[in-house]
Structures are given as structure tokens and as C-alpha cells.
Regions:
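A short, well-ordered alpha-helix in the C-terminal region of glycosyltransferases
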Residues: 163, 170-184, 191-197
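Glycosyltransferase donor-sugar binding loop
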Residues: 26, 53-68
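Nucleotide-activated donor-binding/catalytic signature segment of Leloir-type glycosyltransferases, i.e.
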Residues: 67-87
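Aromatic "clamp/platform" in nucleotide-sugar-dependent glycosyltransferases that forms part
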Residues: 105
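Conserved donor-binding/catalytic core segment of Leloir-type glycosyltransferases
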Residues: 15-33, 39-42, 55
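Acidic anion/phosphate-binding donor-loop and adjacent secondary structure
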Residues: 1-19
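Conserved acidic donor-binding segment of nucleotide-sugar-dependent glycosyltransferases
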Residues: 136-154, 163-168
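Short hydrophobic beta-strand element within catalytic cores of glycosyltransferases
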Residues: 122-125, 130-135
């Protein structure tokens, strides 16, 4: 779950962002995030819509060799408007984004999608882990909060970028859908309640006594 209040009242766009469609990726620059596919897709999309700007936000020191390959790819393809910020405070940047993106080849339930929703931002994501459920909704009828693409599909990802850039109304509606979804289903308080109910039901099935006040976190090691 996520504490939505931590991403309320964050700074919005600046003069630097005027006339730009900012696409933000909050990640570690590692192979599992498939940053190379993201860069290639952005390069093709940028050729068709010069307003696009890609922000790759997060540490790159974990796999320096891969990071250097990503830097070199941007240089070799001569792609303008790609920014590697390094480690950041997400509150300082997320409000400036028009859309966020995740091109991973493997995920569980990505926190970055929930953070985007908390900031009213739509998401482009590959179909890994629970990304499809987060974007299209598993048990609600709120609608789409973004676009899901196939893994490592440069053409699809580029087209998703272009579709988002071309339709401000769609971006805003998807951002609000994501916010509604995270508020209804993925806040920390909701997740705690959901897990408590699961444990309670399991205890009842096993014939065990269950009291909410008996649930305690383990003491920290001294």
C-alpha cells in the first residue's frame, strides 16, 4: 500500500517544462527495468512529436556497466531531451510529469505506479506482474488509468507515448481514474484492513482465537 498524503501538494510544472510533454520513469537503471527499450521507443516517438521529454529518475550506480550502455545508446541514437537525474526525492519531480512509464521485464506490484496515481498521473506499463490489474482494474469499473504494452515491444511503447502526448483530456481522465483507484484500494490503511481480514478468516478456519489487539509487530533486535 501507499500513504497517498505523502504525494499531496507537490510542485507542478516549471518554466523549463513549457511546451514539453514530460514522460517520467522512476526506477533503478538496471537490466530488469529494460531501460534500453524505453530509450529506443522514446527515440522513435520523439521523431514524430518533438514536445516529448524523457526523465529517467533514479540511481544508476547499482549496475554501472548497464547504465553506461544506456547513456551510450542515447548518444548513438542522437536522441535529444533525455535526462538521467540520478537519485532524487520523487516529490520534487512527479508533479512535473504528464505521464509516467515502466518498461520492466519483471515486476510484482510496482510502487511507482501507485505513486503516480497518488499524484494524479496516468501510466504506461508493460504487461508484467500486476501492472495490468493496476491500470485496468481487477475488481472495479473505474476504467483505464493508463496503457499496457507487451514486453520489449518498441513500436507499442512508442505509440503509447504518442497517444498520451496527443490527448490531454485522456491523460487527465486517466490520472483521475488512477487516483480514485489508489484511494479506494491501495492506501496503507485499506491494505492493512484487507490483510487483517485474511488473517482473521484463516484463524477462524483453523479454529484459533483471533483478536485484533493481539497482533503485534516483532520487537526490534537489540
Amino acid at each position: 500500500g501507499i500513504r497517498v498524503e505523502n504525494l499531496q501538494n507537490i510542485p507542478g510544472k516549471t518554466e523549463e517544462d513549457e511546451g514539453k510533454i514530460n514522460i517520467g520513469a522512476v526506477l533503478r537503471v538496471t537490466p530488469i527495468k529494460d531501460v534500453k527499450t524505453m530509450i529506443q521507443a522514446f527515440g522513435f516517438a520523439k521523431e514524430k512529436d518533438d514536445r516529448l521529454k524523457l526523465w529517467i529518475m533514479g540511481p544508476w550506480e547499482e549496475d554501472r556497466e548497464y547504465a553506461e550502455e544506456c547513456f551510450q545508446l542515447v548518444s548513438d541514437m542522437e536522441i535529444p531531451d533525455v535526462v538521467f537525474t540520478g537519485r532524487i526525492n520523487i516529490r520534487d519531480y512527479l508533479g512535473r510529469m504528464d505521464v509516467t512509464i515502466l518498461t520492466s521485464i519483471s515486476e510484482g506490484q510496482p510502487l511507482t505506479i501507485l505513486e503516480s496515481y497518488a499524484a494524479h498521473k496516468p501510466v504506461i506499463a508493460t504487461d508484467v506482474g500486476n501492472c495490468y490489474g493496476l491500470i485496468y482494474g481487477e475488481s472495479d469499473d473505474f476504467g483505464a488509468a493508463g496503457i499496457v504494452t507487451h514486453i520489449m515491444n518498441i513500436e507499442e511503447i512508442a505509440q503509447a507515448m504518442l497517444d498520451m502526448a496527443a490527448n490531454e483530456k485522456m491523460r487527465l481522465e486517466m490520472g483521475e481514474t488512477g487516483y480514485r483507484r489508489v484511494m479506494e484500494k491501495y492506501r496503507v490503511e485499506y491494505m492493512q484492513k484487507t490483510y487483517w481480514e485474511i488473517y482473521r478468516d484463516f484463524a477462524e478456519q483453523m479454529g484459533l482465537e483471533w483478536k485484533e489487539e493481539s497482533v503485534k509487530l516483532p520487537d526490534k533486535e537489540k
